[in-house]
C-alpha cells in the first residue's frame, strides 16, 4: 500500500491568539521547532507512511515552506515532504491536501498539527486497520464525563455515555472513498472531521483505540501542558568511584596530606589522606556520578590535579560546578545512594552529619540521600588501613 499523510497546519488559532502573543498555534516553538514539526517527525518515523503533505494557510505558505525547507536540510526525515495551500474551511484545506498527493497514493491519514503528541503506536493502529481492508478508520477514546444535551441554559436530555466516544486524529481512509465523499458533499455542508463526510456519504466508519496523550492544543491553558510534554524527561543514572591513600610517614606520597573530610564534614582524629585538593573521597565520587548523569566526563577532566589552582581546593566547589553544568543540561536529581568503604575510621558516629551536609550541598531533603558504610573484612588496601574508597549512585531525570 502507498499510505500518505495530510498534515493540517492551516488553522487560524483564534482561541489561542492572545495567550500566544498572536502566534498561530501550529507555529508555536517547541524545542526550537514549530509545533507542526513534532507531528511531522512522528509520521516520518512510521514505517507505514510513504510521504507527508503539510497544508499551510495561503498567507503563510511561502514563508512556512521556506522555513520547512531549512528544517529539512538540517534534519531530513527521509521521505518526501510536500506543501499545499489551505482553504477557507478545514474541509477545504483537506481537499487541497488531497489534490497535492502523488498519483501512487492509495491510502491517506488526515492529522491536525494541533495534536503534536501523536505516537507511533496510534499511527500503526490506524495504518494496520487500513491494511486489513477497513476504508475509514478513526481513533477514539471513551467518554468519562456525563454528557448533557442542552438548549440554552436548559438540559433537554442526558446522552448514554456508553454510546459516545471522543474522536481524535489521525483519521485513515481509502483515498478513492474519501475523494468520493468530498465530491458528494454539498457546498454548504460544514464538518469538523473527515469521518463525518464519509458518514454523510453513507459509508461505514470503524474505530481503533486512541491515545490519551494525543491531546489537541486549543485553549490557553493547554500551553502549560505543551511546555511540560514537549520534551518529556528521561530517567538517568550516574555512577562515581574514588580512592585516596592514607598518609604514611614511612612511605610519603607525591601529594600532600590533608585532614579527612567526608561529604564536606571534617572527621576529627581520622587518618590524613593524600590529595591535591582537600581529598574528600565521598564528594569526589559524588561529583563523578553527577557528571555521569549528563555524559559530562569525570572530575579529573574538569579539575585536573596538575592545575595548581586546585591545590587544597574544597571538594564542595567541584560538586557545585558539576551541578551547575548538569542542571544546564536539564538534570533534576531525585535520589543519591552513597557508600564509604574503610576499615578506619568508624563512620557511624558521623553518618547523619555527613548525610545532612550532602543533602544541603545538593539542595535535596535528607530522605533523598542514603549513606552506607562498610569494611572489606580486613582485605585489600582498605582492610590494611592504607586508604579509603567511596561509591556514589545518582538517580534523576533529564530533559533532552
UniProtKB/Swiss-Prot annotation:
Q: Name one GO molecular function term.
A: 2-C-methyl-D-erythritol 4-phosphate cytidylyltransferase activity
- Site annotation Positions MEP for the nucleophilic attack: residues: 161, 216
Has UniProt tagged this entry with the keyword Flavoprotein?
no
Q: Where is this region: 2-C-methyl-D-erythritol 4-phosphate cytidylyltransferase?
A: 1-235
Write out the residues that bind a divalent metal cation. 242, 244, 284
EC? 2.7.7.60, 4.6.1.12
Any one Gene Ontology biological process term?
A: terpenoid biosynthetic process
Catalysis: reaction(s): 2-C-methyl-D-erythritol 4-phosphate + CTP + H(+) = 4-CDP-2-C-methyl-D-erythritol + diphosphate; 4-CDP-2-C-methyl-D-erythritol 2-phosphate = 2-C-methyl-D-erythritol 2,4-cyclic diphosphate + CMP
* Protein family (similarity comment): In the N-terminal section; belongs to the IspD/TarI cytidylyltransferase family. IspD subfamily. In the C-terminal section; belongs to the IspF family.
What name appears for this protein in its UniProt entry?
Answer: Bifunctional enzyme IspD/IspF
Organism the protein comes from:
Solidesulfovibrio magneticus (strain ATCC 700980 / DSM 13731 / RS-1)
Amino acid at each position: 500500500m502507498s499510505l500518505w499523510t495530510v498534515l493540517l497546519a492551516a488553522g487560524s488559532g483564534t482561541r489561542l491568539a492572545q495567550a500566544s502573543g498572536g502566534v498561530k498555534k501550529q507555529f508555536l516553538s517547541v524545542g526550537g521547532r514549530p509545533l507542526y514539526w513534532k507531528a511531522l517527525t512522528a509520521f516520518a518515523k512510521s514505517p507505514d507512511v510513504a510521504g507527508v503533505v503539510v497544508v499551510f494557510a495561503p498567507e503563510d505558505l511561502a514563508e512556512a515552506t521556506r522555513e520547512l525547507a531549512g528544517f529539512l536540510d538540517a534534519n531530513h526525515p527521509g521521505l518526501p515532504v510536500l506543501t499545499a495551500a489551505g482553504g477557507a474551511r478545514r474541509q477545504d484545506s483537506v481537499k487541497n491536501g488531497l489534490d497535492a498527493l502523488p498519483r501512487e497514493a492509495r491510502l491517506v491519514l488526515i492529522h491536525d498539527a494541533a495534536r503534536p503528541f501523536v505516537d507511533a503506536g496510534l499511527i500503526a493502529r490506524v495504518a494496520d486497520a487500513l491494511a486489513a481492508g477497513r476504508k475509514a478508520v478513526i481513533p477514539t477514546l471513551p467518554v468519562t464525563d456525563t454528557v448533557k444535551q442542552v438548549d440554552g441554559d436548559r438540559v433537554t436530555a442526558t446522552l448514554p455515555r456508553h454510546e459516545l466516544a471522543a474522536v481524535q486524529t489521525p483519521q485513515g481512509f481509502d483515498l478513492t472513498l474519501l475523494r468520493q465523499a468530498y465530491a458528494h458533499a454539498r457546498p454548504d455542508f460544514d464538518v469538523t472531521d473527515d469521518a463525518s463526510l464519509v458518514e454523510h456519504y453513507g459509508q461505514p466508519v470503524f474505530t481503533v483505540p486512541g491515545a490519551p496523550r494525543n491531546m489537541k492544543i486549543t485553549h490557553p491553558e493547554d500551553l502549560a501542558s505543551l511546555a511540560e510534554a514537549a520534551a518529556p524527561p528521561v530517567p538517568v543514572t550516574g555512577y562515581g568511584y574514588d580512592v585516596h591513600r592514607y598518609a604514611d610517614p614511612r612511605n610519603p606520597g607525591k601529594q600532600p596530606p590533608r585532614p579527612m573530610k567526608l561529604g564536606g564534614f571534617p572527621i576529627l582524629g581520622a587518618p590524613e589522606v593524600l590529595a591535591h585538593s582537600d581529598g574528600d573521597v565521598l564528594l569526589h565520587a559524588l561529583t563523578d556520578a553527577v557528571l555521569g548523569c549528563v555524559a559530562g566526563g569525570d572530575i579529573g577532566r574538569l579539575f585536573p590535579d596538575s592545575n595548581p589552582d586546585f591545590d587544597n581546593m574544597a571538594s564542595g566547589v567541584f560538586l557545585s560546578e558539576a551541578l551547575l553544568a548538569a542542571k544546564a543540561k536539564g538534570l533534576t536529581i531525585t535520589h543519591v545512594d552513597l557508600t564509604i568503604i574503610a576499615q578506619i575510621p568508624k563512620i557511624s558516629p558521623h553518618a547523619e552529619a555527613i548525610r545532612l551536609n550532602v543533602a544541603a550541598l545538593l539542595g535535596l531533603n535528607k530522605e533523598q540521600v542514603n549513606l552506607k558504610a562498610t569494611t572489606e573484612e580486613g582485605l585489600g588496601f582498605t582492610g590494611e588501613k592504607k586508604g579509603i574508597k567511596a561509591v556514589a549512585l545518582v538517580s534523576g531525570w533529564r530533559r533532552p
